[in-house]
């Protein structure tokens, strides 16, 4: 019951904050709980959901290449420009942060911070025009900050 109340609070905040992806995901989980399918589907989602979500996200990003809107020449030009090189470096850093974040949340077991990450994403979507895809990077920044803090404090 407590988890349902928390999900309803997240749903309310995400609807008010216009974070539609968070609202949809929360509704999906609430429906699974209502149908008592959570016992079967939650373990699968917890194990494979991130991977499946990334596959869909990356596929949607690759569509301009797949449908021919991006050519080999334009790709070559991007990688020889300062913007392309900068994008590559930022991508390396954010992908590294995402890995740190996933490790921090899952392997190190700090999933209790997820409500704060979601709320931050919802607030950013509502008031800053953000898109709530950053909890993994945010948790990566937290993990990196803690690593640096521990090194400095040692």
Curated annotation (Swiss-Prot):
Entry superkingdom: Bacteria
Q: Which HAMAP family match?
A: UPF0756
The UniProt keyword set, sorted, is:
Cell membrane, Membrane, Transmembrane, Transmembrane helix
**Where does the UniProt entry say this protein principally localizes?**
membrane
Q: Which Pfam families match?
A: DUF441
Family note: Belongs to the UPF0756 family.
Which topology term describes how it sits in the membrane? Multi-pass membrane protein
Please state what the protein is called: UPF0756 membrane protein CKR_1028
Task: Give TM segment ranges.
Answer: 5-25, 48-68, 82-102, 113-133
UniProt organism field: Clostridium kluyveri (strain NBRC 12016)
Annotated GO CC locations: plasma membrane
Its subcellular locations are:
Cell membrane
